A protein has these predicted regions:
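Noncatalytic scaffold domains of N-terminal-nucleophile
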Residues: 70-100, 104, 112-113, 117-277, ...
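Bacterial N-terminal signal peptides
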Residues: 51-63
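A short, polar/charged loop-to-alpha-helix boundary motif
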Residues: 452-467
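Internal maturation/activation junctions in enzymes
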Residues: 349-448, 462, 469-470
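Short hydrophobic targeting helices and cationic amphipathic motifs
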Residues: 13-14, 19, 34
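Short alpha-helix boundary/capping segments
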Residues: 1-8
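Bacterial N-terminal signal peptides that target proteins for export
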Residues: 37-54
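Cysteine-centered motifs
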Residues: 16, 22-25, 61
C-alpha cells in the first residue's frame, strides 16, 4: 500500500478482468501531465487519505512502501497490465476514446466532475452495449473544496402505467417482456444524473462537456475488434427495433467489422439537443416527444408525464470502516451495501497470510462474495418502497457470524447458502469509470443499460438505446 501523507493520495483502479491496478500518488506536480486508460472492463476506485475517504473498493494485494519508491517501481514495470501514474489527473474507463475525452476535459481546466460528465456522454457513443443516455446509475464523488463525499442517484423508475402482471406468465414466472423490447424499459435517469452532478460541482460550460460525444457520433467511431465482435453476439437482442438494426448493422443486415467506422447521426442530433437545452431537452422537449411517440407505436409504457416527473437525487453516502479506513459507497438501491458486507467479512481474516492470486486467496474471495450476494438477493431493494436492514447488513458482528460459514478447504454450494437475518443486528452488463483531478476531487461512476444493449429497443429518430430495468 502506498503510504498516505497529508499531501498524497493513492488511487487504486482495479480491473476485475486482468487484475491490473492503477495507482496515482499526488505530489507537487508538473502541469499538463494527465493519464488516461481505456479498455478496462470493470473499474473500481479505492482512495486512501490520512483523513480517509473511499468511493468503491475491492482490495487484496496491498503492500507497504513509500509513495516515491512505489512510483519509481511502477514506472519501470514493463507490462501492459502494470499500474499507471499521472500527476495532474487520471481517467479510467472501459473505452480508450472515452478516456481520452475525459483527459482532454481535465487539460482544458475542467475538474473531475466535468470529466466524468463528458466520459458518460462519450461512452454512450463509443460503448453502446453499456454506456448510455437511456439507462441509469450512481455517481459517487469526493468534493475536495467542501471536504465531503456525496452520491448522485440516477436510478431509473418504473412508468406509471406499469403493472406486475404485464411481465408474468400464467404461472407467475417472469417473461421476456421484462427484458427485451419497449415494455422492458424504465424511465432513464442518466441525463438528469449527469446534469445534477454538473450543476452542483462542475466548472466548465455544460455544452463543452457534451461536444466531444456529439462529434464522435456525427463523425463516427472506428470499431475495435472487441466492439465489432460484441455487436455480433448482441444481434438477436438488437432485432427488438428497426431503429437499433438500422443504427448498428448495414443495410444488408451484416455487421460492421473491426476498423470500419460507425456513424450515429440520430444520436448526434440528440446529444446536440441536450447540449443546448440540458436535461429539459431530454425530459420535456422534442426528445421526450419522440420517446412518447415511439413508445405508443411500439406498445411501450413510458409517457411524457413519466419523463417530466423524473428527478435525480443527491444522497448521503453509505459508510463503514475497513481496517481503520472509512469507506463510502452509494446507498440502496445500489449494491454498495453488499461491498461493505464483503469487506466486513474479509476483515475477519488475516490477508497477509494469503498469496495474491493463490487458490486459497481466490477461494476466500469467492466464498465472501457468495455470502454477500446471497444477502443482496434476499434483502436489497429500493428504500422508497422496501425496508432494507442496512444497519444489520454492515454490522461488524453480523459479518463475523457470516465469516464463520467460510470453510478454508471446502467450497460451498450456491444452493446450500441461505441468506442471513441482518434484521437481528438492527437497532429499534454495466460499465464503470473513475476520474481524479489535480484539485483532489475524485469521481466514481457506475451506470448501465441493465443487460448488454439493454432492451434492444432504440427510440426512432434519436439513437437512444433504452435500458431493460423493468426486469429489476
Amino acid at each position: 500500500m502506498v503510504s498516505a501523507t497529508k499531501t498524497s493520495i493513492a488511487v487504486f483502479f482495479l480491473d476485475c478482468m486482468s487484475l491490473s491496478i492503477c495507482i496515482e500518488c499526488r505530489e507537487p506536480a508538473k502541469r499538463g501531465d494527465y493519464m488516461k486508460m481505456g479498455n478496462i472492463r470493470y473499474g473500481l476506485v479505492l482512495v486512501f487519505r490520512r483523513a480517509s475517504l473511499l468511493t468503491f473498493a475491492i482490495l487484496f494485494c496491498l503492500t507497504s512502501g513509500t509513495a516515491a519508491a512505489q512510483r519509481q517501481t511502477l514506472l519501470e514495470y514493463p507490462s501492459i497490465h502494470s499500474p499507471q501514474v499521472g500527476l495532474q489527473g487520471m481517467v479510467v474507463s472501459q473505452n480508450e476514446i472515452a478516456s481520452e475525452v475525459g483527459a482532454r476535459i481535465l487539460a482544458e481546466g475542467g475538474n473531475a466532475i466535468d470529466a466524468a460528465v463528458a466520459v458518460g456522454f462519450a461512452l454512450a457513443v463509443t460503448l453502446p452495449r453499456a454506456g448510455n443516455i437511456g439507462g441509469d446509475g450512481f455517481l459517487t464523488a469526493y468534493v475536495s473544496g467542501q471536504k465531503k463525499v456525496t452520491v448522485i442517484d440516477f436510478r431509473s423508475t418504473a412508468p406509471q402505467n406499469a403493472k406486475l402482471e404485464m411481465f408474468l406468465d400464467e404461472k407467475g414466472e417472469e417473461t421476456d417482456t421484462a427484458s427485451v423490447g419497449y415494455r422492458a424499459a424504465a424511465v432513464p435517469g442518466t441525463v438528469a444524473g449527469l446534469e445534477l452532478a454538473h450543476k452542483q460541482y462542475g466548472k466548465l460550460p455544460w455544452a463543452q462537456l457534451i461536444a466531444p460525444a456529439t462529434a464522435l457520433a456525427r463523425d463516427g467511431v472506428v470499431l475495435s475488434a472487441d466492439e465489432a465482435f460484441v455487436f455480433g453476439w448482441g444481434k438477436k437482442r438488437l432485432q427488438a427495433s428497426e431503429s437499433a438494426k438500422g443504427a448498428f448493422f448495414k443495410a444488408d443486415g451484416s455487421g460492421y467489422r473491426a476498423g470500419e467506422r460507425l456513424v450515429q447521426s440520430d444520436l448526434a442530433w440528440t446529444l446536440d439537443e441536450i447540449a443546448k437545452g440540458g436535461a429539459d431537452a431530454f425530459y420535456r422537449g422534442e426528445i421526450a416527444a419522440r420517446i412518447e411517440a415511439d413508445m405508443q407505436q411500439q406498445g411501450g409504457l413510458i409517457t411524457r408525464s413519466d419523463l417530466a416527473a423524473y428527478r435525480a437525487i443527491e444522497r448521503e453516502p453509505l459508510s463503514s470502516t475497513y481496517r481503520g479506513y472509512t469507506i463510502y459507497t452509494a446507498p440502496p438501491a445500489s449494491g454498495g451495501v453488499t461491498l461493505l458486507t464483503m469487506l466486513n467479512i474479509l476483515e475477519n481474516f488475516d490477508l497477509s497470510k494469503y498469496e495474491p492470486g493463490s487458490a486459497d486467496a481466490v477461494h476466500l474471495l469467492a466464498e465472501t462474495m457468495r455470502l454477500g450476494n446471497r444477502d443482496r438477493i434476499a434483502h436489497l431493494g429500493d428504500t422508497a418502497f422496501a425496508k432494507v436492514p442496512l444497519e444489520g447488513l454492515i454490522s461488524k458482528k453480523y459479518a463475523a457470524d457470516r465469516a464463520k460459514l467460510i470453510k478454508p478447504r471446502k467450497a460451498s454450494k450456491d444452493a446450500a447458502i441461505k441468506a442471513g437475518n441482518p434484521a437481528d443486528y438492527e437497532s429499534p452488463s454495466t460499465t464503470h469509470y473513475s476520474v481524479a483531478d489535480s484539485e483532489g476531487n475524485l469521481v466514481s461512476v457506475t451506470y448501465t443499460l441493465g443487460s448488454d444493449f439493454g432492451s434492444g429497443a432504440m427510440i426512432a429518430g434519436t439513437g437512444i438505446l433504452l435500458n431493460n430495468q423493468m426486469n429489476n
